[in-house]
Amino acid sequence: MPQLDTSTWSITIMSMIMTLFIVFQLKISKYLYPSNPEPKSMTTLKQLNPWEKKWTKIYSPLSLPQQ
């Protein structure tokens, strides 16, 4: 059974890593970043829940008048 020649593996792996690095650098360099990011104004409007829109009175058994 012939021996597997691994002498070219190191140059193959190094060239693959360099190629991936260059490709990712080119992809990232095409992305446009905002020059001066500013925070958005977060004005939240308070939304009323259905039970907050109208007045309701809750009667618990202990608050009922005694008979």
From Swiss-Prot:
Any one GO biological process: proton motive force-driven ATP synthesis
Locations listed in the record: Mitochondrion membrane
Keyword terms of this UniProt record: Acetylation, ATP synthesis, CF(0), Hydrogen ion transport, Ion transport, Membrane, Mitochondrion, Transmembrane, Transmembrane helix, Transport
Major subcellular site: mitochondrion
Positions of post-translational N6-succinyllysine modification: 54
Membrane topology annotation: Single-pass membrane protein
Bilayer-spanning residue ranges: 8-24
Modified positions (N6-acetyllysine) in chain numbering: 54, 57
Any one GO cellular component localisation term in the record: mitochondrial membrane
GO molecular function: proton transmembrane transporter activity
PANTHER family (UniProt xref): ATP SYNTHASE PROTEIN 8
Record text on subunit structure and interactions: F-type ATPases have 2 components, CF(1) - the catalytic core - and CF(0) - the membrane proton channel. Component of an ATP synthase complex composed of ATP5PB, ATP5MC1, ATP5F1E, ATP5PD, ATP5ME, ATP5PF, ATP5MF, MT-ATP6, MT-ATP8, ATP5F1A, ATP5F1B, ATP5F1D, ATP5F1C, ATP5PO, ATP5MG, ATP5MK and ATP5MJ. Interacts with PRICKLE3.
Family: Belongs to the ATPase protein 8 family.
Protein's job: Mitochondrial membrane ATP synthase (F(1)F(0) ATP synthase or Complex V) produces ATP from ADP in the presence of a proton gradient across the membrane which is generated by electron transport complexes of the respiratory chain. F-type ATPases consist of two structural domains, F(1) - containing the extramembraneous catalytic core and F(0) - containing the membrane proton channel, linked together by a central stalk and a peripheral stalk. During catalysis, ATP synthesis in the catalytic domain of F(1) is coupled via a rotary mechanism of the central stalk subunits to proton translocation.
Name of the protein in question: ATP synthase protein 8
Organism this protein belongs to: Felis silvestris lybica
